[in-house]
Amino acid sequence: MKNNKIIIFDTTLRDGEQALGSSLGINQKLQIALALENLGVDVIEAGFPVSSQGDFKAVQKIASKVKNSTICALSRALDKDIDMAYEALKVAKHFRIHTFIATSTLHIQDKLKKDFDEILSMAKRAIIRARSYTDDVEFSCEDAGRTPIDNLCFMVENAIKAGAKTINIPDTVGYTLPSEFANIIKILFNKVPNIDKAIISVHCHNDLGMATGNSLSAILQGARQIECTINGLGERAGNCALEEVVMAIKTRKDYLQGFYTDIKCENISKTSKLVSAITNESIPSHKAIVGSNAFSHSSGIHQDGVLKNRQTYEIISPSAIGIHENRMLMTARSGRAMIKTCLENLGYDENTYNLDDVYERFLRLADKKGQVYDYDLEALMFLSYESEEENEFVLEKLSVISGNIPTACVCMRIKEELKTEACTGNGPVEAVFNCIARITNLKPVLKAYSINAKSSGVDAQGQVDVDLEFKGRKFHGKGLSTDVIEASAQAFVSAYNAIYRSLKVEERKMA
């Protein structure tokens, strides 16, 4: 085919939302839709209007606000669904009605209790009704991956005759393998006589981990639309991840025949984080493209390679998706080259220190802490081993009262002196933070706060990680407890001790 543009159809707000424990609010959905528009998504599937009044209103509001993306709504092959979709969409500058019906023998017989001819008739009738509202109609053959190929070809041919401009071939249960799914698309192009009258779309689920692979294999056989979600959100194991297919197409143009998308890749990272925050679905650290470890290197061999030439272990530049740094994690696996480079970045000439000595001390600290930060490394240059391990601030006691005015009382030991303060805050965590700031007489800014469960059950331990900014530098702290407020206090105190050690280093520099 001459047109190598791949249309990106995002269904985060419809299929992606089905994976969430609770529905998103209208304003939350609008916020995501506007981010998708800014990302350059061609088609935004905003919801399923007939499913609830809330979904109807959300689709309607998105349709009224988004101007640069086509807004799509889903409907079953039923008149009431299609009519409701139109009512929600009609205010949009560009809109699409997406209707579907199952085509696999299993679904037709066991779920719908009908035969193939009845399903064919329903599909054609639905497409014709949708066409009465708009020329932009998409039809999906649900469970196409398990539909007998002759039936699928016949359904697609008749759907195009009825007026569908986009035909979607979903691997609804993530059953097919890439070569198998590619062959389905290939057969459609070979056997459906009017296939050139429509755009072929694919919608792949990730039950066997094949969603991205199946989608890419399909465009090699002629598909020109990929349906996907931010962070791969979706029912069961999720959907094809937008960030994965887009960056695969961008990175492997040599193999993927010059295909391209209109996605503004530099907005991928921030869109991923926004969706994660709004949906309260954390991004796995090892997630391709957008995971926190996607551009991290901790192995000494890898770090040495990246320091010499980033392409040795990075096939994508972090800046390509809007990340302006790659993380070179200092751990016990890091080599001397990494430590030397970090010290150079901190301004230390190699003639002013003994690398072997610093590296030995670094390993002792890394074995204890796990991850070492630049301020820890700098402390190695000026402080004795005992001073490195010394904590100026120690949390002794903590009590919190929640309610209309959250209040915390914190007792800390500073050297041999006990100091106690009570403070209020917008919540118990802020109240604790205010207490510690007052006791230490240090005023950092809280830049990041996260909680992760480290076990399950009612006695689960929660790990709190915080980043505090002080004098233009970030300091990390970590706490672990079955009480999340106590874990927060531990994390704050940990970061405050890092700040204190950095101040001692500054004093030594000035001496």
Swiss-Prot record:
Top EC class of this enzyme: transferase
Protein keywords: Amino-acid biosynthesis, Branched-chain amino acid biosynthesis, Cytoplasm, Leucine biosynthesis, Manganese, Metal-binding, Transferase
Binding site for Mn(2+): D15, H203, H205, N239
CDD domains xrefs: DRE_TIM_IPMS
The enzyme's E.C. designation: 2.3.3.13
Location of the region described as Regulatory domain in the Swiss-Prot/TrEMBL record: 394-511
Subcellular location(s) of the protein: Cytoplasm
Residues in coiled coil: none
GO biological process: L-leucine biosynthetic process
Disulfide bond annotation, renumbered to this chain: none
Function recorded in the entry: Catalyzes the condensation of the acetyl group of acetyl-CoA with 3-methyl-2-oxobutanoate (2-ketoisovalerate) to form 3-carboxy-3-hydroxy-4-methylpentanoate (2-isopropylmalate).
Protein name: 2-isopropylmalate synthase
Species this chain originates from: Campylobacter jejuni subsp. doylei (strain ATCC BAA-1458 / RM4099 / 269.97)
